[in-house]
């Protein structure tokens, strides 16, 4: 395989992909420099030929890859691999494919799969969109799982989110009829975008009804990102969609909201939700938003009885001793004014 590091130790980032046709190329990920341990490097050197799939840009015969014809489950962005490893341990009758761009997580999962003696898991260290477009045949997947993708919570970064109309249409093509899409997020705003995109995608039917979510299914363990989000007061939303081209959210075939005739209100059919031994997600969207707004704010202090917010991200900071209207020069020669809030 291609080593995730060059000879001088620099990472080799995957090529960017186009989110929308006709627009500039936008990545849904940024490769952050993380700690790559010697054990993870050895995993790439020794275990990649056993578990890894090199990106070739040509269609791949998955039945030949796994040596059997079984249900194929794809997890996009598996992180440290905890959910993918759990699923492979719980259901060895299925074949699992994982895609991740961050080398440390891939190396960690390679070691875990070797420890488990897994034979039904294969990994890509590449951009998921390119893999789906060029290596996965249409209708080849029984399930796609996307757990806690990067929320890109700043407004100007929302365009980098993975769940976009073009990507949803790509998933519909790759799922077989009757297949399943399972997405999870702990950001209320991202859950809203997922509903906006997926509920309106032809061929996808929300199991929980319009803009609905389900309890955490038995096949998904609690992940690291989920635990971190709950500590910050976030809710968790699991969205399940069935691949059904005959009914559901299609233009001209779906009732529409009276206040907005351009948006579908609900799908024409619903499917039973699988039982889960896990408790329901904590909180509703409104409760999560309230907890988020009430969270402790870093960089706040008081001048007497007047609360003031410090611009802690600017070098040079704020002259806390000055009075109203005082100012000082910032780290880049800027004039940083001080405002009461």
From Swiss-Prot:
Molecular function via GO: tRNA (guanine(46)-N7)-methyltransferase activity
Region Interaction with RNA, residue ranges: 156-161
Annotated binding of substrate, by residue: 154, 186
One Pfam family hit: Methyltransf_4
Keyword annotations from UniProtKB, A to Z: Methyltransferase, S-adenosyl-L-methionine, Transferase, tRNA processing
Pathway entry: tRNA modification; N(7)-methylguanine-tRNA biosynthesis
Any GO CC annotation of this UniProt entry: tRNA methyltransferase complex
Entry EC number(s): 2.1.1.33
Record has Iron-sulfur as a keyword: no
PROSITE patterns given in the database record: SAM_MT_TRMB
Residues that span the membrane, as ranges: none
Gene3D superfamilies (UniProt xref): Vaccinia Virus protein VP39
Chain sites annotated for binding S-adenosyl-L-methionine: 75, 100, 127, 150
Active site, renumbered: 150
Catalytic activity: guanosine(46) in tRNA + S-adenosyl-L-methionine = N(7)-methylguanosine(46) in tRNA + S-adenosyl-L-homocysteine
UniProt-listed PANTHER family: 3-DEOXY-D-MANNO-OCTULOSONIC-ACID TRANSFERASE/TRNA GUANINE-N 7 - -METHYLTRANSFERASE (PTHR23417), PENTACOTRIPEPTIDE-REPEAT REGION OF PRORP DOMAIN-CONTAINING PROTEIN (PTHR23417:SF14)
Purpose of the protein: Catalyzes the formation of N(7)-methylguanine at position 46 (m7G46) in tRNA.
Family: Belongs to the class I-like SAM-binding methyltransferase superfamily. TrmB family.
Protein's name in the database: tRNA (guanine-N(7)-)-methyltransferase
Organism expressing this protein natively: Xanthomonas euvesicatoria pv. vesicatoria (strain 85-10)
Lineage, top ranks: Bacteria, Pseudomonadati, Pseudomonadota, Gammaproteobacteria, Lysobacterales
Gene (name only): trmB
